[in-house]
């Protein structure tokens, strides 16, 4: 089972809010997930990115692949180099 760390869209139309989740790569974007490890709100100034660092590092160590966007956010937060 290929596991990915990715964003799940929430919020209203034209007001996105995302949850950072760990999910099987074959499940739909807003479908079933394994764990929720944080949130991302791009509408705030500056953007609010909150994530459980320990959980993120654990999932990365276990082989979960972050998406491009999550990788960029992790680098900005100092979780990944």
Curated annotation (Swiss-Prot):
Listed name of the protein: Small ribosomal subunit protein bS16
Organism for this UniProt entry: Lachnoclostridium phytofermentans (strain ATCC 700394 / DSM 18823 / ISDg)
Keywords: Ribonucleoprotein, Ribosomal protein
Family (UniProt): Belongs to the bacterial ribosomal protein bS16 family.
NCBIfam families on file: S16
Keyword Ribonucleoprotein: yes
GO biological process: translation
Domain of life: Bacteria
Keyword Ribosomal protein applies: yes
Single Gene Ontology MF annotation: structural constituent of ribosome
């Amino acid at each position: 089972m290929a596991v990915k760390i990715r964003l799940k869209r929430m919020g209203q139309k034209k007001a996105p809010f995302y949850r950072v989740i760990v999910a099987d790569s074959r499940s739909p974007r807003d479908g079933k997930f394994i764990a929720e490890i944080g949130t991302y709100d791009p509408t705030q100034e500056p953007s609010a990115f909150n994530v459980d660092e320990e959980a993120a590092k654990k999932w990365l160590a276990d082989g979960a692949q972050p998406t491009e966007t999550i990788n960029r956010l992790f680098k900005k937060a100092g979780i990944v180099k």
